[in-house]
Design a protein with these regions (language model features):
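Structured soluble/peripheral alpha/beta segments that form catalytic or ligand/cofactor-binding pockets
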Residues: 1-365
C-alpha cells in the first residue's frame, strides 16, 4: 500500500478543526492543541497508557480523560500462574480538567484521591511512574515505582481521520522498547523489573472519536541478541487509506510495514437445529454462532510478507461494561510470538517465544 509520511512540523488541526495532514511519522511532529478542536467537547478523548513487562509479569497504568468520564487504571499480570487483576476507578465529567499534556515529550500528569494516586513524571532522558492504591484487590493494596529510560529513538506516530465526521480524528504515538527498572509491591510479594530484562511502551492518544468503534492492537518490546527490538501493529477504525500504524523497531530505528491482519481463531457459541427432525424426509437447518476463541493460537499475516507470526496466548485480560449508551468489550491477550519480521533493508529478524500482547476492543463511547 502507498503510505504518506509526515515530515514537517505544523499544527495538527486547521481553523475548522480538521486534520491538516493525515499519515504517519517517526516522531511527534504535529502540535496538538485541545482548544483547536471544533467537535462537541464530550467527544474529546485523551489518555496516557504505559505497559511495563518482563518475561514473568507486567504492570499497566492508565490516566484517561474521556470528557464525560475520567478513568484511572492499574493492572498487574503474572504470566507464571497465570493471573491478572485490574482496578479502574472512574470519575464523571472530567471535561479536560485532568490537563493531560499536549505533547508526549514534556509535561507531567497525576490523578487520584484519598484511596489511590497514579503519577507520570516526564524528564528529559527518563520517565518516572509512581502509583499506589489502598484497595486494589479487595482490601489488598498495591504500590510501585518504575523508571523508564528514554534513549533517542524513533517511534510510531499516526494521524487518522474519520470519513463520517470531518472534525473527528485520532492522533497517536507509540514509544516502544523503553528500558525499565523498578518494583511493584502486592500481597506480600515484590515484583522486580530488572535492568536488561524489562521494557515499557507508551500509548499516547489524543483525539475526537466517533461513537462506535472496534480496534485491533498488538505490541511487543524486548531484545534480540541484546539489540532493542519490538513492534506496533493495529487497525480497525478511521480512514486508514493514508497509512497504517504497523511498524518494527530495531536498534531504536523504525521500519514501516504495510497491512497486517490479526487471524483470531473462531469457535461455535451455540448449535441449533430447526425445521423438523433429521432423516430422509426431514428438513434440517443448522446455525452456528461463531465467536472469537481468544485462548487458542492466533496467526498474523501481512500484505508485504514482512510480518508473519504465530501467537500462543498465556492469559486474556478481558473486561466488559454495558450500561446502555456506553459499552466496552475488551480482550487484551498476552502471549508469545514466534516467526519472522523483515526490516527495511531486507534483514530477516527471527523471533521465538517473544513476549507481547494482541487485543480486540469494541467500544460504544
Amino acid at each position: 500500500m502507498d503510505q504518506h509520511q509526515i515530515k514537517t512540523r505544523h499544527p495538527l488541526l486547521d481553523e475548522k478543526g480538521r486534520l491538516i495532514e493525515a499519515g504517519y511519522a517517526k516522531e511527534l511532529l504535529m502540535d496538538y492543541d485541545r482548544s483547536a478542536i471544533k467537535a462537541g467537547k464530550l467527544r474529546i478523548k485523551e489518555w496516557d497508557y504505559y505497559l511495563i513487562a518482563c518475561d514473568d509479569f507486567a504492570v499497566a497504568l492508565t490516566i484517561a480523560d474521556n470528557s464525560y468520564m475520567g478513568l484511572d487504571s492499574i493492572s498487574l499480570i503474572d504470566f507464571r500462574i497465570p493471573w491478572e487483576k485490574t482496578t479502574s476507578p472512574m470519575s464523571a465529567f472530567t471535561m479536560g480538567k485532568r490537563r493531560l499534556p499536549s505533547s508526549s515529550i514534556s509535561g507531567n500528569v497525576s490523578s487520584g484521591n484519598k484511596n489511590y494516586n497514579i503519577e507520570f513524571i516526564n524528564n528529559e532522558d527518563h520517565r518516572l511512574l509512581n502509583f499506589h492504591m489502598k484497595k486494589f484487590d479487595g482490601h489488598k493494596p498495591i504500590s510501585g515505582q518504575i523508571r523508564l529510560e528514554c534513549p533517542p529513538s524513533e517511534s510510531m506516530v499516526i494521524a487518522t481521520p474519520f470519513a463520517e465526521k470531518e472534525t473527528a480524528f485520532y492522533y497517536n504515538q507509540k514509544i516502544n522498547c523503553m528500558p525499565a527498572t523498578g518494583k511493584v509491591e502486592f500481597d506480600g510479594k515484590t515484583f522486580e523489573f530488572k535492568e536488561g530484562e524489562s521494557f515499557g511502551v507508551l500509548d499516547w492518544g489524543r483525539g475526537v472519536w466517533t461513537y462506535k468503534n472496534t480496534w485491533y492492537w498488538g505490541s511487543a518490546s524486548g531484545q534480540i541478541d541484546k539489540v532493542p527490538f519490538g513492534w506496533n501493529i493495529g487497525y480497525g477504525f478511521g480512514d486508514t487509506s493514508f497509512a497504517s500504524e504497523n511498524m518494527l523497531f530495531y536498534d531504536n530505528k523504525a521500519h514501516k510495514l504495510g497491512q497486517v491482519t490479526f487471524n483470531i481463531p473462531m469457535k461455535n457459541k451455540k448449535y441449533v437445529t430447526r425445521g423438523g427432525c433429521c432423516g430422509a424426509s426431514g428438513i434440517e437447518a443448522c446455525t452456528a454462532d461463531l465467536i472469537e476463541d481468544y485462548m487458542s493460537p492466533w496467526t498474523f499475516t501481512s500484505d508485504d510478507g514482512r510480518f508473519e507470526m504465530d501467537f500462543v496466548p498465556i492469559i486474556d485480560r478481558a473486561s466488559r461494561t454495558d450500561v446502555k449508551l456506553i459499552c466496552s468489550d475488551q480482550h487484551q491477550v498476552f502471549g508469545r510470538y514466534s516467526g519472522k519480521a523483515v526490516l527495511d533493508d531486507g534483514t530477516v529478524i527471527r523471533v521465538r517465544d517473544f513476549l507481547g500482547f494482541a487485543e480486540k476492543v469494541f467500544n460504544k463511547w
